Amino acid sequence: TDVKLEGYERTKGEGGWGHVVYHTYADNGIKTFTGKENYDTLIQLWKKQGSNLLCKDQLAYHRKSEQKINAGESITLLDEKGEGAIGSLKFYFPEINEQHLQDVWIHMFWDAHQQPDISCPLACLGGNSLGFHDTNYLLSGYNTDGWFYNYFPMPYWKHAKIIIENRSGVPVSLGFSEIAVSRSVYPTSNTGYFRNTPYYTRKHVAGIDSPIAAIQGRGKMVAAHVTCHAERSHIISCEGDVRVYIDGKRTPQVESDGSESYVCYGWGFPTPPEVHPMGGYDGLSDNPWSMTRFCIGDSYPFYSELKFGIESGEYNNQYLEHSGTIFYYGQDKNVLVKTDSLDLNSSRSIKRHSYKAMGNVRRTKLESFFEGNEDRILYVGETVRFESFSSFRVNISSQNEGVRLRRLSDQNDVRQAARVFVDGEEVTERLWYVADSNPYKRWLEDDFEIPAKYTKGKKSLNIRIVPVSMSKEGKNTWNEAEYQVFCYNN
């Protein structure tokens, strides 16, 4: 199928933009979207911001009132043994101010971990680090009268501990707290702990993206929270792209068109607050701003690592100070392991992998850049183009649960596609297809998933790549400069 975006009044010739975040799946068990589905339940759900809609189980409520937290001290709100899940968090600070939003921290420990799984200003958990206006999202929110809530499920299997810390120089009054605990049992094999990345404190970095988060292990990112201050108020500060790199790929898998488009708004941050169920922003006109986006239907799964950054201006040419954190469900284990690589610029690597290409083979030198944070670093290599096929042999782990192929190529030409064969058998679940093109930042890394039924129990694979034309003219645009091989090891 395909996706087509059109403006509301395209006959006027007005410009516009948009972004599509998508997941690819095998056909089995997947129903194609038709546009005729009934959305009533979803619409009603999204209208109930501020209400806990996820937790249907019997809840045990742990409530406390009128607690004073002295400067530099902490209080424990929950210390629970056994198995369960936090179903909701609510806090009321009657004397909240902007400084408290940064100085009152929450720490959450699951299963007696030495380091907290959640550790950040409470404002991050509520989705608003500035506090100028109410921002009520579906799963978290903040009101200017001092209320915070968060409804992300937070499973644990042995122990849960929640602490509030006052890092300010004055006492803070916690008027009310409510922690709802469910006895839901989650399977440990495919459930992650609810976590956040180490809080990225407010700072400017020159010439590169602000590195908001770097995660190691396996999981899926479900929310982003970023705050920005420019050198003075009312300066346009919206042009920096969000860029997300997954599993070590040099090409960002998610890249926004400016900062505000990441939370699904346009034309900067001129009219705070702007809120929809899955995201929005607070602040003052243009800056400072504090934005939140939930990645629920479009979560970002990762199997070895995830990096999240944001530009300062159009090309890191502006003085901006960012802070923030990423929320995710994660496990410590890295389940995607590199087992081999084929470098087509190395005669030794070509020979070792028995690589060959057939049919009008052309080798072309390319001096260009990757998209993203390192788009000013020149990378030099050669690409191979051919009309018939290429083939090569790679090593894998016999204990694999599937294999990922990663290709390095020149994306100057649009709509590259190929059929993939493993040991003579075609991978029929999908075509290797990349729609993108960039004539300026031409180096591209993209991935192809090979299901375990083609790879399990094997120590090596014979790969065959057969280009397919996606154009009316029949032009073949496929090319390759390098392959990396990764195994899923659950």
Segments predicted by a language model, with ranges:
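Periplasmic c-type cytochrome electron-transfer domains
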Residues: 368
